[in-house]
C-alpha cells in the first residue's frame, strides 16, 4: 500500500486527506473550453460568468444550523464558575509540567507538553513550554542517546518540530534493521506506531527516513485498527489519525477527540482530565455565545431575502472554521471578526461562481477595488448592490471593533488582501474571455489568490492584538515560500475535493482539467499527481517553517491553521458547500455534544 492512502482513497471515492482550502470556497465555474484530453476537439461549455441573463441557478440545500442555536441559553454565571475552577487547577498542572528534574526531565516534560497540546491546554503554559524546549534542545542528542522506546522518541520529535526546533530525523535510524527496513517487532507497539505516524507528518523534503516511516506506519496502523487486537478506544483514535493526522488537523478537533481517548486510557491523570473537560466546557459555551451573536448580526443584515437562491447562510459553519486559528477562549472577539470576514469572502465567491454574468462580476470587483460603486453598478440587477453593501458593512463592523484599539493598520492591510482576493475572481473571468485554456502555471498564479488563503491569514492577523502588525503583514505581503506553499496546498485540496461537483455543474476550468490538458494525462493520473503535489508541498511548508526563525510562532501558525481547515473542509469531498457529512459531525461534537 502506497503512502497515498493516507491522503485519500483511489479516484472515485470520497477524499480522505491527512492531515486543510479552500475551507470556505469552492472551485471556479466553467470558464474555458473543455479540452481535458489532448487530441480531442474542444467542447465549448457555457460560462457562469457570461453575458447571458438566462442563468441556471445551482441551488444549495439550506443549512440545518441557521436557527439551531437561536433558543439555546448560555448561562454566563456558569461560565464564571468554570473559569474559577480552571484557574484553581492551573498551578497544579504547571507543577506537573515543571517539576521534573534531572537527566530525564526533558523527556518527561516533552511527553507532558504533547499531552497538553493534544488536550487543548498548551495555551495556558506557553512561557513554560517555550523555556522547557529551548533549554532541552541544547542537549537533546545527549538526552535521547540511549532511548529505544518508539513512542518516546516519536513524541519528543513531534513536540520539538511542532514548536519550530529542527530536531534531526536521524533519531529514527535506531529503529531499523541492518537491511535498512524498520524492525518488524515495532508493529506490535500500536501506540508507538501511531506516534511514529504522527511524527512522520512533520517531515521535510530531505527527511527521506520519514517518508519510509509514513509508509511503514500507515500500512500497519490500518491492520492494527481493523484486526480487533487493539482496545476499541485506541482503534478509534488510530482511525481518526489515519483520516487526518494531528499535525494537519484543527487543534480544537484534536482536543475533542483526544479528551475522549485519554479518558479511556489506563493510568490517565484524573486532574489533567478534569482540567481538559472544564476547559472544553468553557470553550463550548463561548462558541455558542458567539454563534448566537453572529446569527443575530447576519439576520439584521436582511440579506438572504434580497438575493437569488444561489447563496445560503452558513454562519455556524464559518464560525467553526474560524476556530482553526482562534480556538482559545481569549480570542472570542477575533473569532467573531474572522467569521464576518469569511462570510464576505464566501458571498463574493458564490456570486462569481454560481450566478453573476461577466459584466456583473466586472462591476462588483471594480467597485470593491474602489471601495465605492462604479458607474456600471446602477445598470445591473439590485442583488449586486446587496452583495456590495454586505461586504462593506462586514468591514465596517470590523472597523468599529479595531479602530478604538488603535489597530486600523491591520484592518487596512486585511482590506487590501481582500481586494486582491476579489480581483482574482475577475482575473479568472478575463482568462475565460480570451477563449483559451490557460496553462496549469497560469491557472495556479491566479488560483493561489482566488482560493482565499492569503486573505484568511490577513484576517487572522487582524484578530491578534499581541503581535507587531507591521512586521506580520510585511511577512504576508512578501509572499514567502512558506506562505506560497500554504496557498498551494489549499488550492490543490479544493481542486481535488470539488472536481466531481464542478464537472456535474458544467464547470471545467478546474486545476485538474488545466493539468490534464497541458500534460495529456487521464483523470486517474491527475488525481494521483495532485495528491503527490499535496504531500510534497506539505513537506516544503514544514521545511520553510523550520527555516523561518525571524517571525513569531503565532504568526506562522496562521498559515498552518489555514491549511488545517482546508484538510478538515475537504477531507470527505467539498465539505463547505455540502457540509452535511463529516463537517456536520464535527459541528455536533463541538457545539452540541457534552463532555
UniProtKB/Swiss-Prot annotation:
Enzyme class: lyase
GO biological process, one term: diterpenoid biosynthetic process
SUPFAM superfamilies, sorted: Terpenoid cyclases/Protein prenyltransferases, Terpenoid synthases
Gene3D superfamilies, sorted: Farnesyl Diphosphate Synthase, Terpene synthase, N-terminal domain
Subcellular location: Cytoplasm
Pfam assignment, any one: Terpene_synth
Residues at which Mg(2+) 2 binds: 349, 353
Principal cellular location given in the protein's record: cytoplasm
Recorded GO MF terms: magnesium ion binding; terpene synthase activity
Sorted UniProt keywords: Cytoplasm, Lyase, Magnesium, Manganese, Metal-binding
Residue window of motif DDXXD motif: 349-353
Signal peptide: none
GO cellular component, one term: cytoplasm
Family note: Belongs to the terpene synthase family. Tpsa subfamily.
Domain free text: The Asp-Asp-Xaa-Xaa-Asp/Glu (DDXXD/E) motif is important for the catalytic activity, presumably through binding to Mg(2+).
Protein name: Putative terpenoid synthase 16
Source organism (scientific name): Arabidopsis thaliana (Mouse-ear cress)
Amino acid at each position: 500500500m502506497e503512502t497515498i492512502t493516507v491522503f485519500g482513497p483511489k479516484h472515485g471515492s470520497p477524499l480522505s486527506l491527512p492531515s486543510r482550502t479552500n475551507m470556505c470556497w469552492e472551485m471556479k465555474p466553467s470558464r474555458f473550453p473543455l479540452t481535458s484530453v489532448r487530441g480531442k476537439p474542444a467542447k465549448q461549455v457555457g460560462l457562469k460568468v457570461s453575458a447571458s441573463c438566462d442563468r441556471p441557478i445551482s441551488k444549495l440545500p439550506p443549512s440545518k444550523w441557521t436557527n439551531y442555536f437561536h433558543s439555546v441559553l448560555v448561562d454566563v454565571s456558569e461560565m464564571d464558575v468554570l473559569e474559577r475552577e480552571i484557574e484553581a487547577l492551573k498551578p497544579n498542572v504547571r507543577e506537573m509540567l515543571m517539576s521534573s528534574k534531572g537527566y530525564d526531565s526533558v523527556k518527561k516534560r516533552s511527553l507532558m507538553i504533547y499531552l497538553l497540546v493534544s488536550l487543548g491546554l498548551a495555551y495556558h503554559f506557553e512561557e513554560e513550554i517555550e523555556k522547557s524546549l529551548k533549554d532541552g534542545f541544547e542537549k537533546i542528542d545527549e538526552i535521547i542517546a540511549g532511548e529505544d522506546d518508539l513512542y518516546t522518541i516519536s513524541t519528543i520529535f513531534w513536540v520539538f518540530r511542532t514548536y519550530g526546533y529542527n530536531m534531526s530525523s536521524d533519531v529514527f535510524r535506531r529503529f531499523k534493521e541492518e537491511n535498512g527496513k524498520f524492525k518488524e517487532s515495532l508493529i506490535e507497539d500500536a501506540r508507538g506506531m501511531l506516534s511514529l505516524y504522527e511524527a512522520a507528518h512533520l517531515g521535510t523534503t530531505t527527511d527521506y527516513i520519514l517518508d519510509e516511516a509514513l509508509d511503514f506506519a500507515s500500512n500497519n496502523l490500518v491492520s492494527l485498527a481493523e484486526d480487533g487486537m487493539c482496545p476499541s478506544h485506541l482503534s478509534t483514535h488510530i482511525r481518526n489519525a489515519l483520516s487526518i493526522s494531528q499535525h494537519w488537523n484543527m487543534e480544537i478537533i484534536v482536543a475533542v477527540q483526544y479528551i475522549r481517548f485519554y479518558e479511556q486510557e489506563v493510568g490517565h491523570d484524573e486532574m489533567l482530565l478534569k482540567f481538559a473537560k472544564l476547559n472544553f466546557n468553557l470553550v463550548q459555551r463561548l462558541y455558542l455565545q458567539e454563534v448566537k451573536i453572529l446569527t443575530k448580526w447576519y439576520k439584521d443584515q436582511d440579506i438572504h431575502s434580497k438575493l437569488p437562491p444561489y447563496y445560503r447562510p452558513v454562519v455556524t459553519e464559518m464560525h467553526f472554521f474560524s476556530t482553526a486559528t482562534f480556538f482559545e477562549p481569549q480570542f472570542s472577539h477575533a473569532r467573531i471578526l474572522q467569521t464576518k470576514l469569511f462570510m464576505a469572502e464566501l458571498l463574493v465567491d458564490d456570486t462569481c461562481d454560481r450566478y453573476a454574468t461577466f459584466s456583473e462580476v466586472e462591476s462588483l470587483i471594480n467597485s470593491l477595488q474602489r471601495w465605492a460603486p462604479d458607474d456600471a453598478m446602477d445598470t445591473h440587477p439590485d442583488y449586486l448592490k446587496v452583495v456590495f453593501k454586505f461586504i462593506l458593512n462586514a468591514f465596517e463592523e470590523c472597523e468599529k471593533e479595531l479602530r478604538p484599539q488603535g489597530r486600523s493598520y491591520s484592518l487596512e492591510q486585511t482590506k487590501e488582501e481582500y481586494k486582491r482576493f476579489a480581483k482574482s475572481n475577475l482575473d479568472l473571468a478575463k482568462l475565460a474571455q480570451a477563449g483559451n485554456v490557460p496553462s496549469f502555471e497560469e491557472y495556479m498564479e491566479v488560483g493561489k489568490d482566488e482560493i482565499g488563503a492569503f486573505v484568511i491569514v490577513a484576517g487572522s492577523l487582524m484578530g491578534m492584538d499581541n503581535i507587531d502588525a507591521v512586521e506580520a503583514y510585511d511577512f504576508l505581503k512578501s509572499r514567502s515560500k512558506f506562505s506560497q506553499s500554504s496557498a498551494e496546498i489549499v488550492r490543490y485540496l479544493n481542486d481535488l475535493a470539488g472536481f466531481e461537483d464542478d464537472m456535474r455543474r458544467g464547470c471545467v476550468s478546474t486545476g485538474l482539467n488545466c493539468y490534464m490538458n497541458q500534460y495529456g494525462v487521464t483523470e486517474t493520473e491527475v488525481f494521483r499527481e495532485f495528491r503527490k503535489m499535496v504531500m510534497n508541498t506539505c513537506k516544503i511548508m514544514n521545511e520553510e517553517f523550520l527555516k523561518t526563525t525571524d517571525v513569531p510562532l503565532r504568526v506562522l501558525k496562521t498559515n498552518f491553521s489555514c491549511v488545517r481547515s482546508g484538510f478538515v473542509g475537504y477531507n470527505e469531498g467539498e465539505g463547505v458547500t455540502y457540509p452535511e457529512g463529516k463537517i456536520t459531525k464535527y459541528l455536533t461534537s463541538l457545539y452540541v455534544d457534552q463532555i
